[in-house]
């Protein structure tokens, strides 16, 4: 980690960057990590730290979940051309529903509900179809454009013109022949979304089924996020791969399409590498996103993305009504540049929404330059705040300082090295730890060897997650100093106010005490409004109801010759070592 310290120190001096090179803070040192633990313990005691099972942004390429502020870094959303599908969900005849006479007007009629998706790989996990209760829907008699079979389709009235031409309306059905480009259609019924709720349909891609799914899934549910801006006005719902889907399914008691492993754990149909599981037999082992394949694999003339193969299968099975390429903005991992998935994970969260109003209020006291960045980009971000996903499934970084019993009924959050050693002594007395064990490094794997004892005498194992590196950054105003070398400080029982009081007293002089917090001034690029600026602000407000900086200058981004953001990762940045050598520090 410190291999190039001398090189960077030399560059820093040439740039004239005013910083203490003799006493840097180093985020991997125990003293720094210990202070992060202390902050997290403060949050835990305030009820701001919790574990939840939710659908979150997840990067298969990086192997970890991502926070909302990571997903909103500049350049993370990129335009992609993906295969979109309007799928046909065939309604069941053997059901008791008030609309049955309108849905099926004769014994031969095949009636389907149309739902659009830009993520065909989620279709095997479909568990429900969501409608807007007040939206107007219609039933249209027509023919499937791929199988040429007669079909009656249900979709939103406002979106009929996306799929049907007015001049083809009411043309003679008897004149239609398989393969004709002109497809006749006719509206034969209309409904409100609330009328459709409860209708049941056949599972679209029945790779996984069980009694609970058959009884409680594959039905129409109401949802407040359904619109008629695009698609069909009916939302394909895969509860394990979308936050809105997850919420809507839970509110309507719809089970998720999952498999069960040998330990009894429920798992989605896509693994954490982004591949279909074996149960999805037609596509087992295939990556769900084209970008997860290597460049070499994608150059193969026979290569076809999984979404395309799904579209082909649905066409063959008379379950696709419209397939085309669709260009849209899609989130990518800021570390790997690969698309993310929305994925169900057990994660630890910081409840930033609990202090949202205070974050907004205190932001108005900060002097932003330009002001529009503070009121606009940063202010809007705070107004739409979600809880901070703290967990990271990685090996190197700051470990989460929480130990839990296997049943999850008891937990401890450790706030210092001394506090951990005291808990280890209790575990030794309980027979869970060897008396000779010493903790000298707070990283994995050493910290994972620590077993603690609960109040009821049960074993407690550390939660295996690390914490978001942006927490490391946002905690810098405190962690750069470490816990005060007092009994109260070393035990981790010091209050935030006492922490600042101690370091203010010991960083100045007798005649002029120091003032370590809040910072008088910080400066960074506009991309940090949802990065460092946010984490500084959030931690400061949650820890002791204060801003972290009084003044901030937020500059724009230096772009390359093509107008793209310069990035070390992309290799399009000007090399400062070369430019300083050639032109000197000032021009650079």
What function would you assign to each model-found segment?
Residues 43, 80-83, 132:
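Metal-dependent nucleotidyl/phosphoryl-transfer cores and adjacent nucleic-acid-binding surfaces
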């Amino acid at each position: 980690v410190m291999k190039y310290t001398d090189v960077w120190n030399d560059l820093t001096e040439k740039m004239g960057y005013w910083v203490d090179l003799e006493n840097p803070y180093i985020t991997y040192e125990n003293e720094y990590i210990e202070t992060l633990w202390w902050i997290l313990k403060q949050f835990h005691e305030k009820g701001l730290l919790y574990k939840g099972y939710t659908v979150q942004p997840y990067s298969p390429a990086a192997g970890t979940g991502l926070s909302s502020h990571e997903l909103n870094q500049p350049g993370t959303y990129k335009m992609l051309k993906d295969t979109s599908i309007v799928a046909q969900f065939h309604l069941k005849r053997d059901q008791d529903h008030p609309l049955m006479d309108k849905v099926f007007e004769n014994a031969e009629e095949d009636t389907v509900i149309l739902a659009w998706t830009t993520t065909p790989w989620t279709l095997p996990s479909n568990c429900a179809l969501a409608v807007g209760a007040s939206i107007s829907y219609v039933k249209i008699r027509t023919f499937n454009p791929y199988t040429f079979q007669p079909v009656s389709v249900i979709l939103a009235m406002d979106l009929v013109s996306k799929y049907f031409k007015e001049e083809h309306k009411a043309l003679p059905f008897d004149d239609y022949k398989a393969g004709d480009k002109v497809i006749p259609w006719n509206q034969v019924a209309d409904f409100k979304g609330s009328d459709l709720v409860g209708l049941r349909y056949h599972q679209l891609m029945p790779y996984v089924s069980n009694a609970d799914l058959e009884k409680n899934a594959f039905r129409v549910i109401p949802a407040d996020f359904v619109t008629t801006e695009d698609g069909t006005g009916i939302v394909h719902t895969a509860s394990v791969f979308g936050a809105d889907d997850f919420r809507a399914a839970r509110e309507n008691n719809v089970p998720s399409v999952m498999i069960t492993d040998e330990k009894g754990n429920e798992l989605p149909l896509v693994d954490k590498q982004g591949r279909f599981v074996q149960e999805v037999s037609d596509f087992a082992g295939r990556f769900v996103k084209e970008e997860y394949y290597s460049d070499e694999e994608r150059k193969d003339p026979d290569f076809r993305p999984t979404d395309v193969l799904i579209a082909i299968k649905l066409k063959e099975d008379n379950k696709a009504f419209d397939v085309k390429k669709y260009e849209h903005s899609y989130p990518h991992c800021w570390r790997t540049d690969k698309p993310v998935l929305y994925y169900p994970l057990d994660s630890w969260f910081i409840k930033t929404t609990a202090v949202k109003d205070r974050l907004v209020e205190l932001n108005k006291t900060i002097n932003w330059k330009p002001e529009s960045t503070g009121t606009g980009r940063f202010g809007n971000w705070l107004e739409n705040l979600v809880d901070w996903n703290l967990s990271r499934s990685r090996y190197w970084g700051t470990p989460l300082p929480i130990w839990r019993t296997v049943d999850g009924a008891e937990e401890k959050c450790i706030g210092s090295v001394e506090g951990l050693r005291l808990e280890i002594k209790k575990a030794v007395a309980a027979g869970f730890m060897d008396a000779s064990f010493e903790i000298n490094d707070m990283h994995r794997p050493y910290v994972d060897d620590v077993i603690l004892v609960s109040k009821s005498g049960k074993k407690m194992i550390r939660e295996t997650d690390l914490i978001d590196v942006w927490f490391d950054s946002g905690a810098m105003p405190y962690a750069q100093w470490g816990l005060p070398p007092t009994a109260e400080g070393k035990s981790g029982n010091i209050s935030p106010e006492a922490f600042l009081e101690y370091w203010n007293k010991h960083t100045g002089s007798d005649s002029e005490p120091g003032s370590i917090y809040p910072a008088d001034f910080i400066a960074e690029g506009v991309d940090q409004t949802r990065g460092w600026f946010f984490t500084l602000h959030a931690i400061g407000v949650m820890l002791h109801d204060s801003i972290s900086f009084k003044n901030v200058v937020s500059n724009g981004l230096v772009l390359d010759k093509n107008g793209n953001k310069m990035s070390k990762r992309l290799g399009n940045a000007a090399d400062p070592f070369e430019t300083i050598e050639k032109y000197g520090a000032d021009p650079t």
